Regions:
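Helix-rich C-terminal "collar"/helical-bundle subdomain used as an assembly and partner-interaction module
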Residues: 8, 17-144
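Solvent-exposed, charged amphipathic helical/linker segments at domain boundaries
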Residues: 1-13
Length: 144
């Protein structure tokens, strides 16, 4: 059950990062319905997403890595081929702007889950809203 659960969390994060919001929400619902903690799920997701954010920041910096793969490795993404290819796809799907916003969005989600949205429907909605913010259809603040 542990590895299956872990795989499902990774699939959920991959789906959300790739803009497959409906799939991510469906996986989230399955995990929550199975009794998983919203805070625990978001903590696991945050670990992965912070690495994407770090890679995007490295790529935009003055001493940037030579490739997307190198930036991801430097950010702490596992160097086995499947992990790197999924991370590259996620980073490309999210784009640098949304990747750089992830820490702020994660902090807001964390505060919300630890306050009024700690359980039940409010927790589910807070995480769903976060996935929607990650979606490629979500506009940047300066876009109309």
């Amino acid at each position: 059950e542990g590895m299956g659960h872990q795989r499902t969390v990774w699939e959920m994060v991959d789906a959300a990062a790739a803009g497959r919001t409906t799939e991510a929400i469906s996986l989230l619902n399955g995990l929550l319905d199975a009794g998983e903690s919203p805070i625990g799920l978001t903590a696991q997701a945050a670990t992965v997403l912070r690495r994407y954010s770090t890679a995007a920041r490295l790529l935009g910096g003055p001493d940037r890595p030579t490739s997307l793969g190198a930036a991801l490795k430097e950010a702490g993404v596992a160097s086995w081929p499947k992990a790197l290819s999924q991370a590259e796809l996620a980073l490309r799907s999210l784009g640098s702007h949304r990747c750089r916003e992830l820490p702020k969005w994660l902090e807001s989600l964390d505060r919300s889950l630890k306050a009024e949205s700690s359980r039940g429907l409010r927790a589910r909605l807070a995480i769903e809203r976060f996935f929607c913010m990650m979606s490629t259809s979500a506009k940047k603040p300066h876009e109309k």
